[in-house]
Structures are given as structure tokens and as C-alpha cells.
Amino acid sequence: MPFYLFLRRLRRSPAAVCGLIGLALLVFIALFAPWLAPVDPNWQDAAARLEAPGARHWLGTDSYGRDLLSRLIYGTRPALGLVALVTVITLPAGLLVGILSGYYGGWVERILMRFTDVVMSMPRLILAFAFVAMLGPGLVNGALALALTTWPAYARQARSEIQRLRHSDYLAAAEMMGIRGLRLLVGHILPLCLPSAIVRLALDLAGIILAAAGLGFLGLGARPPMAEWGAMIADGMQVIFDQWWIAAIPGGAILFASLAFNLLGDGLRDVLEPQHD
């Protein structure tokens, strides 16, 4: 699809436009966090512990006296950073396994797909938590754990598409022109798999945000004292009946990010896969 046509269809999709606006807002906040945050997110004020939202602290403070607005702003960085790392690992790995197994078939397909089935047979979140428990807490380890449990779905999707197109006239014509091997896989087969993979990724990112928050909630995400939405909810759970806003505010941020990715995924599906309309 030409890029200008893609942009035209994207502008006509309200869901995609809303999702892009929400994602752009999150990226803007993450990039300019030092200028947007009113104070240092790790600065502790013992005299202002568990302070309610007010003129001094717009969203209140946590149990250590840290400004919640500043920590909420800085929390976008590990959230989007983890999403970016998972995307960089998951999409190439899943497409590589799926394209190789679908195109070559035979023993290559059997080995790759059996390994894929083994990974898919395990509960995704439990497997991710187990990986992080073995590797240790941290942003990179969390991204690796989530990526290792996410790529099989992309591999199976790419494999099914390649099997459907393997004997098409399009690929037969390319092979008759002498286009084979890596050139065929990258130049002709990969572009056929990308649209559906991008749509699936956009829809999966909402779940990845929730899984990342779950890791932070259990203390397996970003290392303290780095601001992280899941860890902020865990801190707020201890005083949720009296100072409910400490957990509700980062929960609202997670909801906003998930909604933005879901809307973007729905819009991209309408644009890149019109047969779903």
C-alpha cells in the first residue's frame, strides 16, 4: 500500500486518530519528563507523607513523601521503554521463525513449530514471571521475559500466511525471474506478512503494558527507586482504604496507555486489513 494512501485511510479512522493522539501524548511526556515534572521524582519529604492532592502537590504524595505527579510523569519512561524493547525483540523473532518454517517446510518447519508449540503451551504470564525470577528484576530482563513469551503467536500467524501464499502466482513469478533465497524472503515475502503482524502487535501492546505493570507490582520490574506504575500501585495498596488516590492515579495511567494502544490497533486493522470491516 502506498504511504500516502495509508495516511489517508488512517485519518479517516477515528479509533486510529484517537490512539495516535494518546500515544503521541505519552511519548511527549516521556521525552520531556525532566521539564514537565514539578520536582525530582525520588525526592522525599517526610513532613508531607501521604498528603492529599492539593496546591502544593497536585496529585498528592506517597508513603515516602514523594510527589505523585512527578513519579507518574517519569513512570512513562520505563513503560514505553519496555514496550519498545519487547517490540524490537518480538516482531523480528516471530516473523523470522514463521517465514522460515512456512517457506521451507519439511524438517525446518517441524523443528521450529514444535518449539513454538512448547512455548505457547505454557501460561504466558506465569512463564514471564518465572523468567524474571531467574534473570533478576530490571527493565531489560522484564522486556526479555515478555518477549520470550510473546513471539510464538507472530510465528504461527506468519507461517499460516506463507503457507497460503507459497504457491501463489506472485511468488512463482518472482522465482522465475531468478529471485531466490534471502532476497525473496526479505523483498517479497516479508512485506506480505508485515501488515497483519503490525496490527497484532498494536493490539498486543495493551496486554504488554498490563503485564509490565504486573511485573512492577510484584517487585520484578524496574529497580527502585525508579518510578514505575506497577510499583506505585503496590505502594498504594498498603493504604488504599485511607489514601486511595495513591493506587488509583497510576492505575488510571495504565488504563489510558492500554486504551490508546487498543484504539490504535483497531484503527490499523481497519486500514491494513479492510476485510475485517
Residue positions per predicted region:
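Membrane-water interface segments at the C-terminal ends of transmembrane alpha-helices
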Residues: 20-40, 75, 114-138, 147, ...
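Glycine-rich helix-loop "coupling/hinge" segments at transmembrane-helix boundaries
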Residues: 131-134, 146, 161-162, 211-253, ...
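Generic hydrophobic transmembrane alpha-helix motif, especially the helices
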Residues: 58, 62, 68, 92, ...
